[in-house]
Amino acid sequence: MITKRIIPCLDVKDGRVVKGVNFQGLSDVSSPVELGQYYSDSGADELVFYDITASSEGRRLFTDILTEVARTIFIPLTVGGGISTLDDFDRVLKCGADKVSVNSGAIRNPRLIFEAAKRYGDQCVVLSADVKRVDGVFRVFAKGGRENTGMEAIAWIKKGVELGAGEVVVNSIDTDGVKRGFDLEMLDAVCSAVSVPVIASGGAGGIGDFVTLFKTIPRVDAGLAASIFHFGEVTIPALKAALKENKIPVREV
């Protein structure tokens, strides 16, 4: 049986891990290197590193901190933020990333997904979609959730997978940092539309939200969270123990 993955997320701004609510009001949390090592040692299955202002500021992702994080951890690392070209893929992979997450860059140039999958393999290409309800319709947002693209989210995610994305991270702006549970309706729609692994992001407020996620939508492959892990509200060993008790398969800590 395929185990469910638990993935902490480091949202990095100016070299520090930050966290906000609904993609707004960012507050300083910790050093990405220290936090990355803590999660690697605590039983996290993977780590996600987002340079959250690279796209909106029109610059390339910070590679010095990324290299240090990659050297410190012993779990797979997915990296995103400001990824617009194959050169960007090369740069972060050389820093030690295992997978590269594309978002705004792929919206501007969808062929980037195809070219990257062809060069590195689809297992290396992660499509990250920031999604919000607008008048009852799931819409894709770009530039760290600041810009409504007008694109319908499910159609865009399907297109990204058809172009070669081997995994999808669905970030719910509506539930981000609110801690009232994952957006199950949106995740169910995405899982029904694609056959690649889907990672749920945004809204985890406690262990019960992960149990509900995996029980309600078994096709979801992984749960990603930030606040509850960063502030010690939930530890990964405790979360995995609870999932195991609920007969949800996880990798042993």
Predicted regions and their residues:
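Catalytic cores of alpha/beta
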Residues: 77-78, 83-96, 185-222
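Glycine-rich, proline-tolerant flexible connector loops at the mouths of alpha/beta enzymes
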Residues: 46-64, 104, 169-181
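C-terminal helical cap(s) of enzyme catalytic domains, especially alpha/beta-barrels
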Residues: 113-120, 214-252
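Glycine/small-residue-rich loop that forms an oxyanion/phosphate-binding "nest" at active or ligand-binding sites
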Residues: 53, 61-120
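Conserved anion-binding
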Residues: 12-14, 18, 97-170, 174-175
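Alpha-helix-loop-beta-strand connector modules within alpha/beta enzyme cores
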Residues: 57-78, 115-130, 180-205, 247-248
